[in-house]
Structure formats: structure tokens, C-alpha cells
């Protein structure tokens, strides 16, 4: 069983921060941290593509080709596309390929505090559009090869997801599994959670 680092229950559902790899879990939605070319060649995105099989890479390549026909970028920062889970269909119904801010790029790094919330807002809108979702499984967006500063990013990620689960409108899902493996990110998330626990929406249910 995956290690549970944190659980917090809000008005409409629960955020659980768990260890392991995303494909070890299951839910209606798997989110992969894509790049703007949808190439499936970097970091966690490459690992998810490998688990889902060549058909996923073929699907995202076809999306890119269709976008280029109309002179549009394959998938601009903050936006997302949806594919089948292909070889992961025993665990998931849809895969959302979401492009968060790439902090290796100075222009995106400067705007990262605005771009990351917009990325999640577009993910949440897509989940509503898909419907019939109970569980969302995702690694923390932009915290891997895109080099978002972990301490800032950990707090912002918690703020965004918990705020959505505690908003007046139903979020469109009941459980968000944030799957973490990077030890530095885990350490920073634990620190910001401990320091700001009374400011986050909801109630801690880690030991429940």
C-alpha cells in the first residue's frame, strides 16, 4: 500500500498526498504533466507514456499534426488535451495531458504564480466537461523537470486543490490523489503544511 503523507477533507471531497507512481493508483482521470509539444519525452510524462504504450504517443502526435494544420500550437502553457489511457485502461478512463509553466524558460518563470493556478483551473474545467468523475490521480504539475521552486510550489498546489474542493460549486470529483515521489518536494510539502495547516481549507484527516 502506498504511503499516505497527508489527507485533508474539505466541503466537497478529500485531497490525499500519497507516495509511489501515478499508474500504481486508479481513478477515472489520470493527469500527466505534458510539454507544449505533447512529445511524451520528459520526466514523469515520459514514464506515463511508456506505461500507456506507443498508442498514446501516436495519439498526441496526431493532435500536434492537426493543430499545425490550423497554425495553432500543439498545447500552449496552461492548456490541456484528453486521450484514452490505452494500456492503462484497466486503471483509468481518461488521461489529461496538462501543460504547466516551464520554469526553465525565463518568461514562464516570471509568470509562474499566475500560470500554475490557470493550469489547474483549466484541468478542473476539463474534469467538469468529462463528467462522471470520482477520483483524480496526478503528480504535482511543474514540480519535476519544469523546475518550479518546490517550497513555493508545494504551498500553491495545496492552496489550489484544497480551495477547489472547498469552494461553493462542486468540483466535479470527490477525491484528488496527489502522487509524489521526489524527496525534496515531499520534505517541502510537509514543511509548508505544518507551518500553514490552520490556514488551509478543510480539516486534517491524515490519521483518520
What are these regions (language model features)?
Residues 1-208:
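Macrodomain-like recognition of ADP-ribose-binding/processing modules
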Amino acid at each position: 500500500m502506498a504511503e499516505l503523507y497527508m489527507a485533508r477533507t474539505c466541503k466537497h471531497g478529500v485531497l490525499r498526498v500519497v507516495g509511489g507512481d501515478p499508474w500504481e493508483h486508479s481513478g477515472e482521470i489520470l493527469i500527466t504533466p505534458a510539454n507544449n509539444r505533447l512529445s511524451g519525452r520528459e520526466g514523469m510524462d515520459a514514464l506515463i507514456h511508456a506505461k500507456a504504450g506507443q498508442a498514446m504517443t501516436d495519439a498526441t502526435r496526431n493532435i500536434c499534426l492537426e493543430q499545425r494544420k490550423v497554425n495553432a500550437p500543439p498545447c500552449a502553457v496552461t492548456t490541456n488535451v484528453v486521450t484514452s489511457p490505452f494500456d492503462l485502461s484497466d486503471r483509468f478512463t481518461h488521461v489529461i495531458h496538462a501543460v504547466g509553466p516551464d520554469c526553465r524558460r525565463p518568461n514562464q518563470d516570471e509568470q509562474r504564480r499566475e500560470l500554475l493556478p490557470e493550469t489547474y483551473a483549466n484541468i478542473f474545467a476539463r474534469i467538469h466537461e468529462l463528467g462522471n468523475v470520482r477520483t483524480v490521480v496526478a503528480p504535482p504539475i511543474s514540480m519535476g523537470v519544469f523546475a518550479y521552486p518546490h517550497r513555493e510550489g508545494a504551498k500553491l498546489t495545496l492552496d489550489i486543490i484544497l480551495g477547489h474542493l472547498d469552494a461553493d460549486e462542486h468540483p466535479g470529483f470527490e477525491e484528488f490523489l496527489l502522487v509524489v515521489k521526489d524527496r525534496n518536494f515531499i520534505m517541502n510539502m510537509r514543511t509548508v503544511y505544518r507551518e500553514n495547516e490552520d490556514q488551509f481549507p478543510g480539516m486534517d484527516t491524515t490519521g483518520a
